[in-house]
Amino acid sequence: MVKAVAVLASSEGVKGTIFFSQEGDGPTSVTGSVSGLKPGLHGFHVHALGDTTNGCMSTGPHFNPTGKEHGAPQDENRHAGDLGNITAGADGVANVNVSDSQIPLTGAHSIIGRAVVVHADPDDLGKGGHELSKTTGNAGGRVACGIIGLQG
């Protein structure tokens, strides 16, 4: 079993810890929680770069090693890093529990060293008709991020 973790932080008081685990070539399990969010849906993605020198802005675009358009997690045509939305309750806490086969922790398309990003707004899953729908899901600003690091 391979395990990884990302500690999310921001200047806006949003914080959290996201855990990743993968057994063999199976899907990667993503669990954890994020607090300090406004209630509602927030885009949740793996971004290409593990660079936070300019905060979450320097994490680059969504992780997309196969050059596809943005989509929903269940879509065949999607960025590998498109994990859809997380939902924050009235207390501002979003619990994460996702399983995904396009974000491996080993191999050529490993997400180790990349970043997980929480967005200000809902991800329209590429179906919103906005000019940004097919690239970012029109999910708005980046309110928290963390670099995905290998765990022992």
UniProtKB/Swiss-Prot annotation:
It comes from the Eukaryota. Keywords: Antioxidant, Copper, Cytoplasm, Disulfide bond, Metal-binding, Oxidoreductase, Zinc. SUPFAM superfamilies: Cu,Zn superoxide dismutase-like. The keyword Transport does not apply. Binds 1 copper ion per subunit. Pfam families: Sod_Cu. Its cofactor is Cu cation; Zn(2+). GO terms for cellular component: cytoplasm. One of its GO terms (molecular function) is copper ion binding. Disulfide bonds join C56-C145. It is found in: Cytoplasm. Cu cation binds at H45, H47, H62, H119. Zn(2+) binds at H62, H70, H79, D82. It is an enzyme of class 1 (oxidoreductase). Its EC number is 1.15.1.1. PANTHER family: SUPEROXIDE DISMUTASE CU-ZN -RELATED. Belongs to the Cu-Zn superoxide dismutase family. Destroys radicals which are normally produced within the cells and which are toxic to biological systems. Homodimer. This is Superoxide dismutase [Cu-Zn] 2. It comes from Oryza sativa subsp. japonica (Rice). The lineage of its organism: Eukaryota, Viridiplantae, Streptophyta, Embryophyta, Tracheophyta.
